[in-house]
A protein has these predicted regions:
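Extracellular/oxidizing-compartment recognition motifs
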Residues: 1-171
Length: 171
């Protein structure tokens, strides 16, 4: 399996949210977006907020971060293939408020497909790209125990074909 950095997907949409409106007995409601981020903009994620990132297409890939935070800060990244919609209607199988990452369709939604990172005592930004796992996802949901600054975020596809093995192109 090869990480194809040359095929890296950049975020198409990214927003932070905190809180929910319109929840009821039959629906989780809708997220309250606190900030939307432009492509290539540094993302500052405060503790207590959730970042949702849309990479624009589903892929077998790993998220790749260039980020910084205080030592001991724990970041959790949850990949998902779709977002909750329809006001988070429980009868439609939604597992959270509209706009949040949907994970009920995963075999091990609570214990699998989870990426945790704990920041060490370093100066400046750290780079992290997992090399011993991969996920199938289009979206990621990111939370942290303290403020995190994300300078760069990409989704790096995995494949069994290196760039050098390619023999043609599709146009």
């Amino acid at each position: 399996i090869y990480l194809r950095h040359d095929l890296a997907l950049k975020p198409k949409l990214a927003y932070a949210w905190k809180g929910v409106t319109g929840e009821s007995e039959n629906a989780y409601g809708k997220i309250v977006i606190t900030k939307e981020f432009q492509p290539d903009q540094e993302i500052v994620l405060p503790a207590g907020e959730t970042l949702v990132v849309d990479f624009g297409q589903n892929a077998a890939a790993v998220p790749s971060f260039v980020f910084s935070a205080k030592a001991g800060t724990k970041l959790t990244c949850l990949p998902s293939e779709l977002l909750n919609d329809g006001n988070g209607a429980k009868e439609r199988g939604m597992d959270g408020p509209e706009g949040s990452c949907h994970r009920t369709n995963l075999r091990m939604q609570d214990t699998g497909m989870i990426l945790d990172y704990t920041f060490a005592d370093n100066k400046g930004y750290a780079s992290f790209t997992p090399h011993n796992t991969f996920f199938g996802y289009r979206f990621i949901s990111v939370t942290a125990t303290d403020e995190v600054k994300i300078k760069q975020l990409e989704s790096i596809p995995v494949t069994s074909i290196t760039k050098e093995m390619e023999t043609g192109t599709i146009t």
